[in-house]
A protein has these predicted regions:
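Short, Lys/Arg-enriched charge-dense amphipathic segments
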Residues: 48-55, 96-98
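Hydrophobic alpha-helical bundle architecture
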Residues: 1-51, 63-67
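Extended hydrophobic packing segments that form well-structured cores
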Residues: 19-21, 26, 40, 61, ...
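Non-transmembrane, aqueous-exposed alpha-helical and coiled segments at domain scale
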Residues: 1-8, 14-17, 54-57, 72-80, ...
Length: 109
């Protein structure tokens, strides 16, 4: 856990610059961010967001809220996915060739 800017792309870049090897990025609305240096695993617990943006999101955690899986089952699947990504499986952003979602000047405080 690091103190980074609130802008999605800038916060991911800050985490990676600080040494993060895999960014686990939680999103409610489905920000399709990625990075060229380290994988960005995007997860949501919003089932509407996952349904709409499943091509851009890597993990659907909404089953914790709506079932039928238990917290333990979801946690086990999440950890298997993290291990698979660490072993080379591409996250959605990498598979889509989506690396950074900022074009032009970004003012970050």
């Amino acid at each position: 856990i690091m103190d980074t800017p609130s802008n999605d792309a800038a916060s991911v870049a800050g985490l990676i610059a600080g040494g993060c090897q895999l960014v686990v990025f939680t999103t409610g609305l489905g920000t399709p961010t990625g990075n060229a240096v380290a994988p960005v695993m995007k997860i949501t617990a919003n089932k509407k967001t996952y349904k709409t943006m499943q091509d851009n999101l890597d993990f659907d955690a909404s089953h914790v809220i709506y079932g039928p899986e238990t917290m333990e089952e979801i946690t086990d699947q999440f950890m298997r996915d993290v291990i698979d990504i660490c072993n080379g499986r591409l996250v959605k952003a990498e598979a889509l060739g989506y690396l950074i979602n900022v074009a032009g000047t970004a003012v970050i405080q």
